């Protein structure tokens, strides 16, 4: 049996954690202060950067506001000390069985795990970090970060924009970094017919949207330009970025102006999903209701709002999570609600109902390895078919799923971690399952989305990449979540330097090439030959985006039956 700590260390690689680093000494000068309409916000300074962490952007979603859309702040909060550790929203703590310790043992003594602390329902806050020299007249571009964590974990506690801001300052193309806290798990993405009827679905997405509206109202006071916002996310955060493009049928405006002008998606894009009141959603809802002791209540949803915090937390966490055998067949995720998310994201994309903004989107080479470690009883092709039929795609027949599985050779040398021959075969179908999960949720879904985007909006620039710099890591390869450490500058090297430079160019100019220092290859638009920028360990190169073409074709032609 795995301990909770071991599971947490694993999920640290899944992108909810960044390394712990020694905090820089606070500069001895007057604390930076920003006057908002509803509060005086006091921050801290270090390394020429002012940080304001834990600024409330919504009323606390507690009591009668639990499981309700976020509400703007209406009163005066007085002085807000935005200098400590922001409270995390309630987390979905998971258990995972049967993963050999030696796979992740090397991570235990490295600084890849930082425990999320101080969690609670009063968690809707936002972080702002800016160059100390920025004034309301600076009009700096803004990078708006949405964390990942499978819609179950994550917090702004774990992400710091210092490395990105320092690089931007050194290159005289300053940016402001913003990170938003949003509700996760059953607090933010509870499905069910009662939830839909109440208008309380996809609360985590609505939290993010209110955070963007807060930026539109307030970021100028910190030196930012509300008309130059790029939204960026990883994993569930990247899926959220896509959903922010798709909310309200692609209307991303607030008071007549766009909330963002560009988008960056690391390891995530479109996730076809059944409605919030689908049978699977009802099963999740009824399980939570039962565990909370609300099954006999006249109004079950009202009962869920009235139980104490610990009771609801335990009930919300009683369903399968991402580290369980179910893997990425998530209990909690954005689902069509007929209101904010009017249809499955894939259908909105095909209908052209998306915010039309330039974007960067990419993946790690081995996205599926971390999600395939526990299914060691899957040893045959039929086992694979049964697994996807039982846990994932209830709208597909076994014959259709067998056809999908057959597009992946029953040959370890063709599986993930890719390009490793017959090595790293943890159990008989491990590399095949890892290849499929990585493609279905991330890599080939990205390609299908890009095909749609470029057919619907050929004038909109799109850029795509593949990270392969962790190729030598046994069992995992360049796994899901490894890009977080690279993007935030915690693993110095050519990949980190490259990604930060290209992203800073995009945030400033909506073009990853404009302003990027000499020596970096030109990143072509994806429409120009369907080429990926390949971030390798010691160099960058271009790679044709045509691998696993038969599988990609099947996915594109059968998206309607491959809903989670």
UniProtKB/Swiss-Prot annotation:
Entry keyword set: Disulfide bond, Glycoprotein, Hydrolase, Lipid metabolism, Secreted, Signal
Gene3D superfamilies assigned to the protein according to its UniProt record, in alphabetical order: alpha/beta hydrolase
Subcellular location: Secreted
Catalytic activity as recorded in UniProt: a triacylglycerol + H2O = a diacylglycerol + a fatty acid + H(+)
EC number: 3.1.1.3
Active-site residues (renumbered): 235 (acyl-ester intermediate)
GO biological process: lipid metabolic process
Membrane-spanning intervals of the chain: none
Chief location bin: secreted
Glycosylation sites: 377
Species of provenance: Arthroderma benhamiae (strain ATCC MYA-4681 / CBS 112371) (Trichophyton mentagrophytes)
Pfam families associated with the record: COesterase
Name of this protein: Probable secreted lipase ARB_02369
Record bears the keyword Lipid metabolism: yes
Disulphide bonds in the chain: 89-123
Entry keyword Nuclease: no
Signal peptide span: 1-17
GO cellular component: extracellular region
Family designation: Belongs to the type-B carboxylesterase/lipase family.
Induction: Expression is down-regulated in presence of human keratinocytes.
Annotated GO MF terms: triacylglycerol lipase activity
């Amino acid at each position: 049996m795995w301990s909770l700590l071991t599971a947490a260390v694993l999920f640290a690689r899944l992108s909810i954690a960044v390394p712990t680093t020694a905090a820089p000494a606070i500069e001895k000068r007057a604390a930076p202060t920003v006057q908002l309409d509803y509060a005086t916000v006091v921050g801290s300074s270090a390394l020429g950067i002012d940080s304001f962490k834990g600024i409330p952007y919504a009323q606390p979603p507690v009591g009668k506001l639990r499981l309700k859309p976020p509400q703007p702040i209406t009163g005066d909060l007085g002085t807000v000390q935005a200098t400590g550790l922001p409270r995390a929203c309630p987390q979905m703590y998971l258990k995972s069985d049967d993963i050999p310790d030696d796979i992740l043992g090397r991570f235990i003594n490295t600084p890849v795990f930082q425990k999320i602390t101080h969690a609670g329902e009063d968690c809707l806050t936002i972080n702002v970090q800016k160059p100390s020299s920025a004034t309301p007249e600076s009009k700096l571009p803004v990078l708006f970060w949405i964390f990942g964590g499978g819609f179950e974990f994550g917090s702004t506690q774990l992400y710091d924009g210092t490395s990105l801001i320092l690089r931007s300052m050194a290159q005289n193309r300053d940016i402001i970094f913003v990170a938003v806290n949003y509700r996760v798990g059953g607090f933010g993405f509870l499905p069910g017919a009662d939830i839909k009827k109440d208008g309380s679905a996809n609360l985590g997405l609505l939290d993010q949207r209110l955070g963007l509206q807060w930026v539109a109202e307030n970021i100028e006071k910190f030196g930012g330009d509300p008309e130059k916002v790029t939204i960026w996310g990883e994993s569930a955060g990247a899926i959220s970025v896509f959903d922010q493009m798709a909310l309200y049928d692609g209307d991303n405006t607030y008071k007549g102006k766009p909330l963002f002008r560009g988008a960056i998606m690391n390891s995530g894009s479109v996730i076809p999903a059944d409605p919030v009141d689908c049978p699977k959603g009802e099963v999740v809802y009824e399980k939570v209701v039962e565990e909370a002791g609300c099954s006999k209540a006249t109004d079950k949803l009202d009962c869920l709002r009235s139980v104490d915090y610990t009771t609801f937390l335990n009930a919300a966490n009683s369903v399968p999570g991402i580290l369980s055998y179910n893997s990425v067949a998530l209990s909690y995720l954005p689902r069509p609600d007929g209101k904010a998310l009017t249809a499955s994201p894939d259908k909105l994309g095909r209908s052209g109902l998306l915010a039309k903004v330039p974007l960067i989107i990419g993946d790690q080479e081995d996205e599926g390895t971390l999600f395939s470690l526990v299914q060691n009883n899957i040893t045959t092709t039929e086992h694979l078919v049964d697994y996807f039929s039982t846990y994932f795609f209830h709208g597909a027949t076994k014959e259709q799923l067998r056809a999908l599985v057959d597009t992946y050779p029953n040959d370890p040398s063709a599986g993930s971690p890719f390009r490793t021959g017959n090595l790293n075969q943890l159990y008989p179908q491990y590399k095949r399952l890892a290849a499929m999960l990585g493609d279905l949720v991330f890599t080939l879904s990205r390609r299908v989305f890009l095909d749609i985007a470029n057919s619907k909006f050929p004038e909109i620039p799109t850029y795509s990449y593949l990270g392969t710099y962790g190729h030598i890591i046994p069992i995992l390869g360049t796994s899901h979540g490894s890009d977080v450490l690279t993007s935030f500058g915690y693993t110095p090297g050519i990949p980190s330097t490259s990604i930060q430079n290209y992203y800073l160019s995009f945030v400033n100019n909506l073009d990853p090439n404009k302003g990027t220092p000499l020596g970096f290859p030109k990143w072509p638009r994806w429409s120009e030959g369907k080429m990926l920028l390949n971030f390798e360990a010691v160099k960058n190169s271009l790679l044709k985006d045509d691998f696993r073409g038969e599988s990609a074709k099947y996915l594109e032609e059968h998206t309607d039956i491959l809903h989670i």
